[in-house]
Structures are given as structure tokens and as C-alpha cells.
């Protein structure tokens, strides 16, 4: 895992808790070792199942904004539950790194 993530573990936990995150995963170039100064960070998220659709939307965009502020990089955030492509889902499941689990 990249040092940028390791250095911010405590703050990341606080962000996840305040945004009703059940699980947060890192994937992509940050996991594969191909991260460059211009790379974005790729995250997949599972939110608490108790959220209403409106609360889910608010939490999604709040989490994205908080992650971008924390890491000073563009963030690609996807909701893990909506991944439909079986090839992408298999690759995601093989490579993802769990950063937070409630």
C-alpha cells in the first residue's frame, strides 16, 4: 500500500465513519505499483445498508470530496454494489485492498 494511504489511516477511518462507510477498498494503480504523480486514486465503497437512497447519494459525494481533500488527488469512487461487469468485478475482487471495515 502506498505511503500516502498509510500516513493517513487515522483520518481515513474518521472520514469513513462520518460518511456511513461499511467497507472501503483501494484498487488500480495505487495497488499495482503503477501510481504516478498525476494518477488518480481508485476506491470502491460499500455504504451502510440503513441509508436511504437520498442519504446514500449525499454520503457518496461527501466521501469523494473528503478523500480528494485528504489525499490531494483526483479520486475515482465507485459503489461496489453496482459493479455489474463480471470481468471487472473479478479483477476488482482479486486486486482490491481493504482500507476500512466497520
Predicted features by range, described:
Residues 44-46:
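Short hydrophobic/aromatic beta-strand micro-patches
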Residues 1-25, 31-33, 37, 50-102:
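Catalytic core of pol beta-like nucleotidyltransferases
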Amino acid at each position: 500500500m502506498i505511503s500516502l494511504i498509510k500516513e493517513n489511516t487515522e483520518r481515513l477511518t474518521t472520514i469513513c465513519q462520518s460518511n456511513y462507510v461499511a467497507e472501503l477498498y483501494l484498487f488500480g494503480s495505487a495497488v499495482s505499483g503503477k501510481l504516478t504523480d498525476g494518477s488518480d486514486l481508485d476506491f470502491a465503497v460499500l455504504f451502510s445498508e440503513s441509508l436511504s437512497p437520498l442519504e446514500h447519494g449525499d454520503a457518496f459525494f461527501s466521501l469523494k470530496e473528503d478523500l480528494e481533500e485528504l489525499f490531494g488527488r483526483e479520486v475515482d469512487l465507485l459503489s461496489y454494489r453496482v459493479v455489474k461487469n463480471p470481468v471487472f468485478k473479478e479483477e476488482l475482487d482479486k486486486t482490491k485492498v481493504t482500507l476500512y471495515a466497520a
